Design a protein with these regions (language model features):
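Amphipathic alpha-helical dimerization/coiled-coil segments
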Residues: 13-28, 112-169
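Basic, Lys/Arg-rich alpha-helical nucleic-acid-recognition elements, primarily the DNA-binding modules
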Residues: 2, 7, 11, 16-114
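A generic structured-segment signal
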Residues: 38, 74, 98-100, 106-118, ...
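Cysteine/selenocysteine-centered motifs that mediate thiol-based redox chemistry or coordinate metal-sulfur cofactors
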Residues: 274-294
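A conditional alpha-helix N-cap/helix-loop micro-motif detector
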Residues: 33, 151-152, 178
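HKD (HxKxxxxD) catalytic microenvironment of the phospholipase D
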Residues: 227-269, 277
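Primarily the HKD phosphodiesterase
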Residues: 161-217
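HKD-type phospholipase D/PLD-like phosphodiesterase module
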Residues: 202-240
Length: 294
């Protein structure tokens, strides 16, 4: 089940979301919900959705090429074009070509969020968005291109590949520090890759970590700013990214779950993960070694 953390911040965000859809001049929320439900009804058609996205790909099309691309009759497509036009999602130009309105374009941008959640509905029966701020949840459609990877062996393998493919940087938000990932990231840092990470105060760390860090030259890399690190109270959502690809692990029962991830090298997916990392980095505190227990 998709849930949100029940804390003051999240409750305030949910209230703000409720206020967001209110506006002056409406009698009550029922009127707004009724209007929204009417628009959902217009979108509850595979052909009408296809028409919208065909127009998004290439704005301004006549009915004939649309019907051909959709493999439908002109009469059938015309009927759906009329419905979309009446709802304000598209408009018909004087030359007979159809194009998306601002409203129609915006709806196409919002649909990927529904697509992402519906495509991975089974996954989100057990996982949730944890402590992700609402403003990022509202951008969940940017994650729609992500591939779902399941199994700790496969997720760690993909994690290592993100390290391997990095040429500029690796950024991470960590709930634990997997021992098998230490050597791969250290080698990349020594080859000039910038490493920044945020770790939970309660992070699980391998035995002998301190000794290994000293022998590896980790602290010298930290001194010359090749490595920068911060700390936050807890980490529910784990993120790993380089300059061109990213992974995200959502929590299960409020705890970070490294056995399943979403991965993509799509620019929009990467942008979401990078923005989220920067948000957490800005709001994280100073790294305190004594809080990590081996």
């Amino acid at each position: 089940m998709i849930t949100f953390q029940d804390d003051p911040t999240t409750r305030r965000q949910n209230w703000n979301c409720h206020l967001f859809i209110e506006h002056r001049g409406c009698k009550n929320m029922t009127d707004i919900y009724e209007k929204v439900s009417d628009y959902f009804l217009e979108l509850a058609s595979l052909q009408r959705l296809n028409i919208l996205f065909k127009l998004l790909e290439r704005n301004r099309k006549r009915i004939e090429p649309l019907a051909k691309e959709l493999g439908a009759t002109k009469q059938e497509v015309h009927r759906n074009l009329v419905r979309l036009e009446e709802s304000g999602l598209i408009t018909k130009e004087k030359d007979g070509k159809y194009s998306l309105t601002t409203f129609g374009k915006t709806m196409c941008v919002e649909i990927p969020s529904i697509l992402f959640l519906s495509q991975h509905n089974e996954y989100f029966q057990e996982h949730d968005f944890g402590d992700i701020p609402l403003k990022f949840v509202m951008r969940a459609g940017q994650l729609a291109t992500g591939s779902h990877i399941k199994g700790i062996t496969k997720t760690l393998q993909k994690w290592k590949s993100v390290y391997s493919n990095a040429n500029e940087y690796v950024y991470e938000i960590l709930s634990e520090i997997p021992e098998e990932l230490f050597d791969p990231i250290l080698q990349k840092i020594k080859n000039g890759v910038k490493f920044e990470y945020i770790v939970s105060e309660s992070a699980i760390v391998p035995d002998g970590r301190q000794t290994r860090l000293k022998k590896s030259g980790f602290y010298e890399l930290l001194e010359n700013k090749s490595i920068e690190r911060k700390m936050q109270k807890s980490v529910q959502v784990v993120v790993v990214l380089n300059e061109k690809e990213a992974c995200i692990f959502f929590p299960k029962n409020g705890v970070a779950d490294l056995t399943e991830m979403f991965y993509s090298d799509n620019d929009v997916f990467h942008e979401w993960c990078l923005d989220y990392f920067r948000y957490r980095w800005y709001n994280s505190g100073v790294f305190q070694e004594h809080k990590l227990k081996e």
